[in-house]
């Protein structure tokens, strides 16, 4: 991953790097890989995430339709 440093502005480059890493999901992946996760735990976590995503999409859809 690359970030351009313009006018020796390292703070701005760091901010851009963090934003890119956040979008790519690197921080989330690092957090998940700190400890081994059993395959059964992974399946349960992914299923729970899918349920949360579905509920969120349904809420957004209802909000758009005005219900």
Curated annotation (Swiss-Prot):
It comes from the Bacteria. GO terms for biological process: translation. It holds the Pfam family Ribosomal_S21. GO terms for molecular function: structural constituent of ribosome. InterPro entries: Ribosomal_bS21, Ribosomal_bS21_CS, Ribosomal_bS21_sf. Transmembrane segments: none annotated. Keywords: Ribonucleoprotein, Ribosomal protein. GO terms for cellular component: ribonucleoprotein complex; ribosome. The keyword Lyase does not apply. Signal peptide: none annotated. PANTHER family: MITOCHONDRIAL 28S RIBOSOMAL PROTEIN S21 (PTHR21109), SMALL RIBOSOMAL SUBUNIT PROTEIN BS21M (PTHR21109:SF0). Belongs to the bacterial ribosomal protein bS21 family. HAMAP family: Ribosomal_bS21. NCBIfam families: S21p. This is Small ribosomal subunit protein bS21. It comes from Granulibacter bethesdensis (strain ATCC BAA-1260 / CGDNIH1).
């Amino acid at each position: 991953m690359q970030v351009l440093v313009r006018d020796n502005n390292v703070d701005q480059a760091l901010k851009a790097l963090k934003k890119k890493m956040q979008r790519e999901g690197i921080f989330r992946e690092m957090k998940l890989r700190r400890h081994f996760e059993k395959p059964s735990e992974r399946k349960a976590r992914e299923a729970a995430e899918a349920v949360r995503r579905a509920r969120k999409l349904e809420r957004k859809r209802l909000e758009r339709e005005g219900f």
